[in-house]
Amino acid sequence: MSQPIVVAALYKFVTLEDYVELRDPLLKAMTDNGVKGTLLLANEGINGTVSATREGIDALLAWLRNDPRLVDVDHKESYCDEQPFYRTKVKLKKEIVTLGVPGVDPNKAVGTYVDPKDWNALISDPEVLLIDTRNDYEVAIGTFKGAIDPKTETFREFPDYIKANFDPSKHKKVAMFCTGGIRCEKASSYMLGEGFEAVYHLKGGILKYFEEVAQEESLWDGDCFVFDNRVTVRHDLSEGEYDQCHACRHPIDVKDRESEHYSPGVSCPHCWDTLSEKTRRSAIDRQKQIELAKARNQPHPIGYNYKAEA
């Protein structure tokens, strides 16, 4: 029986003034250990999801933690039978998760971390405003019971949503969550800057909650979107049954795949009537290349349009 692939989502907000110089040695550490996936580097820290054998992930984590600034880098693990990534990349960015608000710095101020074991009690408090900081297509397939959906298409829209809908003088307690902890951590820094006083966020995100909270005690409803080819995971961290539309990135279920508007790699019921003819032709050509690569047992020549958590 083949060894399962370990998928590690990791991040840390920490000042990395030499992040440009870190790119090449980090990429070498990944390739030397057979690690695939994408890591983002910025002055504010590191973020991304990678996958490899147990030995490969352990070797990469050891390499990262050899740097005193990354010795406590946060990471969550899950497993799958096949490699969920096709390439190995290290990208340089202005932000490791893009909020687009100058001055927001989680290295200087963040909300209160809440461990998964204490999360249920917090969000069961009727005075706590519970906000899902993820994008609309993620929220659509699963969220915590009673959570507010901002209906944002990107994290950049989150600040405008907060300004339009909430008042620090009226909303005294705010709790936020996201997939792995990074977006809600940065959101908490933003909220404090806007004058909100009691700001909480789920430490380690939904994935750590799944890992540490028993399913029979869970307040989660649905699957959780992940940023790799598994698309979603269940509460037990096993791979879900969703696919993802390559055109619009929206998760698609069995009902979507049975729709007359679904064409593998080209369109789905969520986007079929919004695609230009040029985009449709490009998607058809891309799908042909992907199917040809699969038939030859080769990595996809173009790959899926997956991005690091954004």
UniProtKB/Swiss-Prot annotation:
GO-annotated molecular function: oxidoreductase activity, acting on paired donors, with incorporation or reduction of molecular oxygen
Keyword annotations of the record: Oxidoreductase, tRNA processing
SUPFAM superfamilies: Rhodanese/Cell cycle control phosphatase
Xref: Pfam families: Rhodanese, UPF0176_N
GO aspect biological process, one term: tRNA modification
Enzyme Commission numbers on file: 1.14.-.-
All copies of domain Rhodanese, residue ranges: 124-218
Gene3D superfamilies registered for this protein in UniProt: 3.30.70.100, Rhodanese-like domain
Free-text function comment from the UniProt entry: Catalyzes oxygen-dependent 5-hydroxyuridine (ho5U) modification at position 34 in tRNAs.
HAMAP family reported for this sequence: TrhO
Family in the record: Belongs to the TrhO family.
Name of protein: tRNA uridine(34) hydroxylase
Source organism of the structure: Pseudomonas entomophila (strain L48)
Lineage of origin: Bacteria, Pseudomonadati, Pseudomonadota, Gammaproteobacteria, Pseudomonadales
